[in-house]
Amino acid sequence: METANYTKVTEFVLTGLSQTREVQLVLFVIFLSFYLFILPGNILIICTIRLDPHLTSPMYFLLANLALLDIWYSSITAPKMLIDFFVERKIISFGGCIAQLFFLHFVGASEMFLLTVMAYDRYAAICRPLHYATIMNRRLCCILVALSWMGGFIHSIIQVALIVRLPFCGPNELDSYFCDITQVVRIACANTFPEELVMICSSGLISVVCFIALLMSYAFLLALLKKHSGSGENTNRAMSTCYSHITIVVLMFGPSIYIYARPFDSFSLDKVVSVFHTVIFPLLNPIIYTLRNKEVKAAMRKVVTKYILCEEK
């Protein structure tokens, strides 16, 4: 890449979601409500799984890790977005932008890999029930979770490494409420086609391949379960769990594919999809998993009664 005497950009200006004051106040109330549900909701999931002796299966261990990632993921953009609703000029430093990029892709990719691990867990539980405890032992679960985090870290490092080598000489306005690669690449003062191609292959291709693989695996499991649909409550519970996982997979991978598996051009739906991806999706995880899982709901009631209500008395 050619070097020149560029005026180095030290900060980026975010356009936000709306310029209308009334709309900003409404959005602030809505997103603050979401965030205040995401944090305690996922913390309650983690505490319930940690404290209840009956929730010791690998599925709940993975669910606790998913809840932790949701807390982290929502906290990357939500706090600054909420503050920016009351700021006339929404600014983020270059370093802050790079940090936001890194953690978004680190946590987001880790969550995708973790969902893949959860699909393998369901496969072992349904197809190899007699050997499930041996196959999905705690040691293997810890290794798979660690590999998910490591995969997310490597993916994020690649994305950030491609961004920091680009020159930025102005303009410095990002048509978004947070720093994302698709926006930052667009304002670089250089030909970014090679970088875009690598990013699309890294983010977009991974999303598409994982999404197709996950849908195929769950379709196979559901077809297998439907053959034994009259065999009892355990089969119905397994089908319910699979439907929950499929819902999460679609909600996670759909927006990601829309954003990253195409050229980084601007479209009218970009902000809406980004809001769904960064704010609404972490909200749906605890709702879907708790509402469709009787064991988790019962355990949550016990934890709330024992550790919260009793202390208040």
Curated annotation (Swiss-Prot):
Residues 1-25, 80-100, 159-195, 261-271 are extracellular. Keywords: Cell membrane, Disulfide bond, G-protein coupled receptor, Glycoprotein, Membrane, Olfaction, Receptor, Sensory transduction, Transducer, Transmembrane, Transmembrane helix. It is found in: Cell membrane. Highly expressed in the testis and olfactory bulb. The chain crosses the membrane at residues 26-49, 58-79, 101-120, 140-158, 196-219, 238-260, 272-291. Gene3D superfamilies: Rhodopsin 7-helix transmembrane proteins. GO terms for cellular component: plasma membrane. InterPro entries: GPCR_Rhodpsn (IPR000276), GPCR_Rhodpsn_7TM (IPR017452), Olfact_rcpt (IPR000725), Olfactory_Receptors (IPR050427). It is a multi-pass membrane protein. Residues 50-57, 121-139, 220-237, 292-313 are cytoplasmic. Glycans are attached at residue 5. Disulfide bonds join 97-189. GO terms for molecular function: G protein-coupled receptor activity; olfactory receptor activity. Olfactory receptor that acts as a receptor of Asprosin hormone, potentially at the surface of hepatocytes and may help to promote hepatocyte glucose release. The human olfactory receptor 4M1 (Q8NGD0) is not the one to one ortholog of mouse Or4m1 (Q8VFT4). Belongs to the G-protein coupled receptor 1 family. This is Olfactory receptor 4M1. The gene is OR4M1.
